Structures are given as structure tokens and as C-alpha cells.
């Protein structure tokens, strides 16, 4: 299985840099295992889903993890300073691990100033990341980060424009509750309160799980034999309540449809445990590619993914590689918008396939 098997040509003009407004007005490509595609809108989920279907939603909350600061050091010529860009990754036992640009010019013990209220000391510098210890913690840190930080937009958007105040709303789901992600669960960005209410009225049910999406979601696959790729790890949790709801839906023969690849990866991680699906908490590095046996997933709502990405491999595993090529060819021909701020799809494989 080669990396090139998951490649395709995407016109640059189809990469979305802003979301649809309102967010639920984005387009929705509905694709079953065979047969014609349906070109709909996200609001049409009310018609496409059935009473009793259960959507599994990721309630992680994106933190403003991108920081721009100034490092200061003394030199033979006197005090010197330089600009530094930091992307927080995850809390460490003390401080935070982070990506830094330029990494090689940072020295352990140096201070980086981000604002009057927020500064950090470089506690460790590794080969590809640093550990920073900030001058404040807890609520004080959250408040200072909210003031100084920017939303960590994906590289393909950040290359075109800087994050702004609008992204604070746009790059956050309406049901975000648990802080810790440095990337949004983007399929869920399409939901607004009106759509959630309409789906409830239709008889669609919801379960909330948490997977803190990490920056590793944007890392490229660097091996040709994709089966040798080492997946990044992310923390997730399925509560007792969510597990019970999902199990009850399955027991009744109804559909479990995760919204987004993060929710899918989390519930399939739990389903692969020796005792079967149930409450779960921990770090998952599950890698889903063609040949994977889905145990709990009956469908998936997901945006359109990058060529040669692990997420292209995931949707190929769900629908079959040939069917996904047909779906993506249709999406490109019909000028669907791609990636995090783009349009969405509802993928419905044969049940039990």
C-alpha cells in the first residue's frame, strides 16, 4: 500500500480560508457504498438522518495556542532580542511542550515575553520541540493566554492569512466544553444551535466524547509504505454515559455516526479493547487505513481531506479506496470547498461491511 495511492490533484482555488456563513449552510456531499451522490447542504442532515440515529460529537475546545513573542539575551555587543513564534502542544509535568520557530536559535534558560502578563522560560530544548515554563498557571494562565494567543489555524490557511478575531468563533464548535485541543474537530464546525435543535426534533440523538486534537494531525506521512507510518498520539475520553448511550443504540440496531475523524478514531479505539466497547480514557495513536475492521462505526460525517494524509487513508478504509476516489472526483468537479473551513460529506458504507 503506497502513499501515492492516496494522492490526488486539488485546485488551489478549492482550499477554503473562511467558513460558510451561517456555518450550517455549507455544502454536504452524501455518498453511500454505491449509487448516485446527493449534493445537499448541511441543513439537509435533518432529511438525510433517521430518527434514532446517534451522532457522536467531540466536545474538545481549541485553545489560542499560537503565541508571538520576543526572546531576550545578553551578548558581547549588549542586550539583543529576536522574534519567536510558539505553538503550544500539550501540558507537561511542569509547563508546556511546544513547537518553536526558529527552534535552533533558542537556548535553555532564555526568557520569551509574549505580553505584559505572559512570559515563559525555555526549560528544555529538544530536537523538534521545547518545554516552556510560564510565569503563571491555572486561571491566570488561561486569562493571559486568551489575551496574548491566537487560534492555531492549519498550515494551509496560515500560509494564506494570519488568524484574526473572527477565527475565535469560526474555529470553535458551538458545543466546545473541555479545553485542550490545538486544532478543531472540523466536521463539527458546521453545527449551529438551530441545526442541533432541528435534529433533536427529528429524533436524532447525540453523545459527547472528548479527544484533544493535536498539531500532529497536520504532520505529513513521510514513508512510502503507509503501513509503517507512526501515528501521533492524542488524549481522549469516553464517559460512562456516552458509552452507555452508544451501546444502547447499537443494541437497538440503530446507527452510530461519529461527526469527524477524531470522534471516529476515539470510539474505534475503545471498541478495539479486549473487553469490547465501553468507557475509555487514555492516549490513542490508532492508525486506520484500508483493511481496518470497523467495530462501532456505521457512517461518518467528515470534511474533505488533504492528499496523502492519514485521514484520506481513514475514509478509504471506511468506503473503499475506489469509492473514495469517485467521491473526491465528484467533489472537485462540483467545486466543493476543501479542508478545515470547507464543505462536508456524509459517508454511509454498507452496514457490516
UniProtKB/Swiss-Prot annotation:
It catalyses: 7-aminomethyl-7-carbaguanosine(34) in tRNA + S-adenosyl-L-methionine = epoxyqueuosine(34) in tRNA + adenine + L-methionine + 2 H(+). Its EC number is 2.4.99.17. GO terms for cellular component: cytoplasm. InterPro entries: QueA, QueA_dom1, QueA_dom2, QueA_sf. It comes from the Bacteria. GO terms for biological process: queuosine biosynthetic process; tRNA wobble guanine modification. Pfam families: Queuosine_synth (PF02547). The keyword Transmembrane helix does not apply. PANTHER family: S-ADENOSYLMETHIONINE:TRNA RIBOSYLTRANSFERASE-ISOMERASE. GO terms for molecular function: S-adenosylmethionine:tRNA ribosyltransferase-isomerase activity. Keywords: Cytoplasm, Queuosine biosynthesis, S-adenosyl-L-methionine, Transferase. Gene3D superfamilies: QueA-like (3.40.1780.10). This is S-adenosylmethionine:tRNA ribosyltransferase-isomerase. Pathway: tRNA modification; tRNA-queuosine biosynthesis. It is found in: Cytoplasm. Transfers and isomerizes the ribose moiety from AdoMet to the 7-aminomethyl group of 7-deazaguanine (preQ1-tRNA) to give epoxyqueuosine (oQ-tRNA). Belongs to the QueA family. Monomer.
Amino acid at each position: 500500500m503506497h502513499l501515492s495511492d492516496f494522492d490526488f490533484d486539488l485546485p488551489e482555488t478549492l482550499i477554503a480560508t473562511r467558513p460558510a456563513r451561517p456555518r450550517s449552510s455549507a455544502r454536504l456531499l452524501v455518498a453511500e457504498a454505491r449509487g448516485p451522490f446527493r449534493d445537499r447542504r448541511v441543513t439537509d442532515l435533518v432529511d438525510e438522518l433517521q430518527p434514532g440515529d446517534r451522532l457522536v460529537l467531540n466536545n474538545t475546545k481549541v485553545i489560542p495556542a499560537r503565541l508571538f513573542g520576543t526572546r531576550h539575551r545578553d551578548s558581547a555587543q549588549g542586550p539583543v532580542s529576536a522574534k519567536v513564534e510558539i505553538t503550544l502542544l500539550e501540558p507537561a509535568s511542569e509547563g508546556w511542550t511546544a513547537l518553536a520557530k526558529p527552534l535552533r536559535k533558542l537556548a535553555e534558560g532564555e526568557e520569551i515575553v509574549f505580553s505584559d502578563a505572559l512570559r515563559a522560560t525555555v526549560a528544555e530544548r529538544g530536537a523538534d520541540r521545547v518545554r516552556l515554563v510560564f510565569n503563571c498557571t491555572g486561571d491566570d494562565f488561561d486569562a493571559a493566554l486568551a489575551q496574548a494567543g491566537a487560534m492555531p489555524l492549519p498550515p494551509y490557511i496560515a500560509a494564506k492569512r494570519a488568524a484574526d478575531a473572527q477565527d475565535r468563533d469560526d474555529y470553535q464548535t458551538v458545543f466546545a466544553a473541555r479545553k485542550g485541543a490545538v486544532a478543531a474537530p472540523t466536521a463539527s464546525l458546521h453545527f449551529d444551535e438551530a441545526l442541533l435543535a432541528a435534529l433533536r426534533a427529528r429524533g436524532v440523538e447525540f453523545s459527547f466524547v472528548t479527544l484533544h486534537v493535536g498539531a500532529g494531525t497536520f504532520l505529513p506521512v513521510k514513508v512510502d509504505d503507509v503501513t509503517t507510518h507512526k501515528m501521533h498520539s492524542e488524549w481522549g475520553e469516553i464517559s460512562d454515559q456516552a458509552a452507555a448511550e452508544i451501546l444502547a443504540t447499537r443494541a437497538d440496531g440503530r446507527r452510530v455516526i461519529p461527526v469527524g475523524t477524531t470522534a471516529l478514531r476515539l470510539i474505534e479505539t475503545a471498541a478495539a479493547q479486549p473487553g469490547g466497547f465501553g468507557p475509555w480514557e487514555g492516549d490513542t495513536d490508532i492508525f486506520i487505513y484500508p483493511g481496518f475492521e470497523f467495530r462501532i462505526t456505521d457512517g461518518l460525517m467528515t470534511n474533505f481531506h488533504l492528499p496523502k494524509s492519514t485521514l484520506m487513508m481513514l475514509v478509504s478504509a471506511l468506503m473503499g479506496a475506489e469509492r473514495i476516489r469517485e467521491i473526491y472526483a465528484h467533489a472537485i468537479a462540483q467545486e466543493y470547498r476543501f479542508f478545515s473551513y470547507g464543505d462536508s460529506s456524509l459517508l454511509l458504507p454498507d452496514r457490516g461491511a
